[in-house]
Amino acid sequence: LTGLFLAMHYTSDIATAFSSVAHICRDVNYGWLIRNIHANGASFFFICIYLHIGRGLYYGSYLYKETWNVGVVLLLLVMMTAFVG
């Protein structure tokens, strides 16, 4: 949800990307808060994913090859999506 609000004001053009982030933080009402919530929420999301992987390792879920491979593919897709934005 916060990503949608940030995307309304962000431009990915190389010449205006940094100024659009400054615009979000300075000119948008509570833009700094939306940006911080977005960053912290994303970090918490990945912590939850890593805990889920750790739980799978602890309980031996890696023995179910097909299920584990689907999870690895989903993890890679989530990481690629987060990196690209």
From Swiss-Prot:
Q: Which GO terms describe its cellular component?
A: mitochondrial inner membrane
Per the entry, the cofactor note is: Binds 2 heme b groups non-covalently.
Question: InterPro entries attached here?
Answer: Cyt_b/b6_N (IPR005797), Cytb/b6-like_sf (IPR027387), Di-haem_cyt_TM (IPR016174)
Question: Where does the sequence pass through the membrane?
Answer: 1-8, 32-53, 68-85
Q: Give the binding site residues for heme b b562.
A: H38
Q: Which GO terms describe its molecular function?
A: metal ion binding; ubiquinol-cytochrome-c reductase activity
Keyword terms: Electron transport, Heme, Iron, Membrane, Metal-binding, Mitochondrion, Mitochondrion inner membrane, Respiratory chain, Transmembrane, Transmembrane helix, Transport, Ubiquinone
Q: Where in the cell is it found?
A: Mitochondrion inner membrane
Chief location category: mitochondrion
Name the positions where heme b b566 binds.
Answer: H52
Give the top-rank taxon of the lineage listed in the UniProt record for this protein. Eukaryota
In Pfam terms, one family for this protein is: Cytochrome_B
Q: What is its membrane topology?
A: Multi-pass membrane protein
Span of the signal peptide: none
Identify the cofactor(s). heme b
Which biological processes are named by the entry's GO terms? mitochondrial electron transport, ubiquinol to cytochrome c
Instruction: Report the protein's function.
Output: Component of the ubiquinol-cytochrome c reductase complex (complex III or cytochrome b-c1 complex) that is part of the mitochondrial respiratory chain. The b-c1 complex mediates electron transfer from ubiquinol to cytochrome c. Contributes to the generation of a proton gradient across the mitochondrial membrane that is then used for ATP synthesis.
Family recorded in the similarity comment: Belongs to the cytochrome b family.
Give the note: Heme 1 (or BL or b562) is low-potential and absorbs at about 562 nm, and heme 2 (or BH or b566) is high-potential and absorbs at about 566 nm.
Subunit comment: The cytochrome bc1 complex contains 3 respiratory subunits (MT-CYB, CYC1 and UQCRFS1), 2 core proteins (UQCRC1 and UQCRC2) and probably 6 low-molecular weight proteins.
Protein name per its UniProtKB record: Cytochrome b
